[in-house]
Swiss-Prot record:
Gene3D superfamilies: PRC-barrel domain, RimM. This is Ribosome maturation factor RimM. Belongs to the RimM family. Pfam families: PRC_RimM, RimM. It is found in: Cytoplasm. One of its GO terms (molecular function) is ribosome binding. An accessory protein needed during the final step in the assembly of 30S ribosomal subunit, possibly for assembly of the head region. Essential for efficient processing of 16S rRNA. May be needed both before and after RbfA during the maturation of 16S rRNA. It has affinity for free ribosomal 30S subunits but not for 70S ribosomes. Residues 94-167 form the PRC barrel domain. It comes from Lachnoclostridium phytofermentans (strain ATCC 700394 / DSM 18823 / ISDg) (Clostridium phytofermentans). InterPro entries: PRC_barrel-like_sf, PRC_RimM, RimM, RimM_N, RimM_N_sf, Transl_B-barrel_sf.
Length: 169
């Protein structure tokens, strides 16, 4: 199955002509200007939608889809995810990763001591924070900074970290 990445969530309708307010889950909402198609995940099926128009309002993206011209045709999709294929995703700079690819990495210390699995990435504004769940069910919060994150290897599904004093009880 092809990897799909979530770029937004339909939060509400906008007007009566089929437009929707989308809460973007990407760090740059201007990326929506470059998109031609998105996949709507209805929960039961996935529908390809062609983007006809893109506008911005506060922290939202306003999208108009081709062939959807009525509020009644789109209202039922509130809360549903908008996805794109990996090939339509933006190119990332070195050291940048899709959160989707990081979830599930096995975290270990520099000496090889296993810590657990990366289960979540918190976006704090200053820097991201990796949530590592240990085998004992505890959580370790690792800031995504050079002092702490030493290596990310997606091929080996491994995250190597340096635990600075105070990160673990």
């Amino acid at each position: 199955m092809e990897d799909l990445l979530r770029v937004g969530v339909i939060s509400s309708t906008h007007g009566i002509k089929g437009e929707v307010k989308v809460f973007p889950t990407t760090d740059d909402m201007n990326r929506f200007k470059k998109l031609k198609m998105v996949t709507l995940d209805t929960g039961k099926e996935q529908k390809e939608l062609e983007i006809e128009n893109v506008k911005f309002f506060k922290q939202f993206v306003i999208l108009k889809f081709k062939g959807i011209d009525n509020i009644n045709d789109i209202e039922k999709y509130k809360g549903k995810d908008l996805l794109i294929s990996r090939e339509n995703a933006v190119d990332l700079a070195e050291g940048e990763f899709f959160i989707f690819d990081l979830i599930g990495l096995q975290a270990e210390e520099e000496d090889g001591n296993s810590l657990g699995e990366l289960t979540e990435v918190l976006q704090t504004g200053a820097n991201d924070v990796f949530v590592i769940k240990t085998k004992q069910g505890k959580e370790i919060l690792i800031p995504y900074i050079d002092d702490c994150v030493k290596k990310i290897d997606l091929n080996e599904k491994k995250l190597v970290v340096h635990l600075i004093p105070g990160l673990v009880e």
